[in-house]
């Protein structure tokens, strides 16, 4: 029979109640499973919490829980490198804690995040994520995070009825879960339902302001839906909150500055980024910014980089760069291929302000066809 533990998180100085939650725990499971759940609450509710890894053979359960916490914090930072580190940590977690659902869910989220950013092959990442989610649900069929992740992936596969049921069930099991709101917002964004995506991400960020992936999704939605100054203001706020440079935010902010004509500020931000060796989300933003600053003089360099990469294997984040360098014809060819491949970005690309002229042209064609 499960134990139900009631936990209250109270500020030591003010004695103010920060949060209270209940946790169901099977006493037959290792203590590390319970500790991971407690640590989950601490990470979500205490800004900038930081624990060092514990080197002790006397407390293996605590050591496993701290390993999970370190992975969770790397995932929260949401940089290309931190997500890769988190992936390695969570793989270790599921091998040492195979009965714990939390690392499986985080492992799945890392795979999806890396695929979204163009840092891993999408189909393989989604397949691996599904395997992790199914394992989590095998252990605990009522895990709201796993159900939310499965709702996200089902929606990405156009299984919308299944997706809606899974999200509804996840919300019922854990009302006001920042993770479930985040997954649902991400699905709405990728499907082009930007208004609903924004409402959901606002709910998520209000509950979990420390998870950078949530904030970055809000930033991208703002860029797609609001005046550029609004997105810049939010990006500057995020940048000031980060003691460590986040290359994703930096690359977006550099692009914003170049779009506004603030080339010196854009150049200063570009200096904080690593040289482009691939075509992930950060590198594409960096190259696009350089094109805005330097124009035709850098076009050949970008084309050489594109020529050295198999563009049939990359995802939709590169399309604005292809449109800028090669023009509409090549863009349309790549976009149609991405639609056939069910690329994660294929449905939302026309909302990208960098592709506004293409969107307007397609809308005009649609109006003409309707009139005919």
Regions found by a protein language model. Give the residues of each.
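Alpha-helical protein-protein interaction modules
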Residues: 198-372
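Residue-level recognition of tetratricopeptide repeat
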Residues: 72, 109, 116, 152, ...
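Short, charge-rich amphipathic alpha-helical segments embedded
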Residues: 91-121, 340-348
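Catalytic-center loop of serine/cysteine hydrolases
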Residues: 1-76, 81-82
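Structural signature of tandem alpha-helical TPR/SEL1-like repeats
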Residues: 82-88, 117-135, 156-169, 190-203, ...
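The tetratricopeptide repeat
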Residues: 66, 103, 110, 146, ...
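Short coil/turn linking the two alpha-helices of tandem helical-hairpin repeats
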Residues: 71-80, 108, 112-120, 157-158, ...
